[in-house]
Amino acid sequence: MAKKSMIEREIKRAKMVQQYAAKRASLKEITTNADLPMEQRFKAQLKLAELPRNSSATRIHNRCQLTGRPHAYYRKLKLSRIMLRELASFGQIPGMVKSSW
């Protein structure tokens, strides 16, 4: 199980990404628009650099909802491979059955 501080840190990052998403998107739009003057695009790039680091979506790391494990993460289920196997073997995931042929 991951430390609670790491899980809380990821939650905090996710909130910050949502908070700054619109501002970050508008600044990125300005910096990539070739029709605008270079000076205006450069100022937008500087403003983008002034935003908090944790407001970037690339800083978020997917973690298991039950254990907080960061590796072997299944996006559709939001679980790690270990919890997926455990819950599936107990029949707690609807529609998932052990394969046999």
Curated annotation (Swiss-Prot):
Name of the protein this chain belongs to? Small ribosomal subunit protein uS14
Spell out the HAMAP family in the cross-references: Ribosomal_uS14_1 (MF_00537)
Listed GO biological process terms? translation
Record's Gene Ontology CC terms?
A: cytoplasm; small ribosomal subunit
* Recorded superkingdom: Bacteria
Subunit structure, interactors included: Part of the 30S ribosomal subunit. Contacts proteins S3 and S10.
Q: What family is this?
A: Belongs to the universal ribosomal protein uS14 family.
One Pfam family this sequence matches: Ribosomal_S14
Q: Which InterPro entries match?
A: Ribosomal_uS14 (IPR001209), Ribosomal_uS14_bac/plastid (IPR023036), Ribosomal_uS14_CS (IPR018271)
Q: Which UniProt keywords apply?
A: Ribonucleoprotein, Ribosomal protein, RNA-binding, rRNA-binding
One annotated GO molecular function is: rRNA binding
Disulfide bridge map: none
Function, as annotated, reads: Binds 16S rRNA, required for the assembly of 30S particles and may also be responsible for determining the conformation of the 16S rRNA at the A site.
Q: Does the keyword Ribosomal protein apply?
A: yes
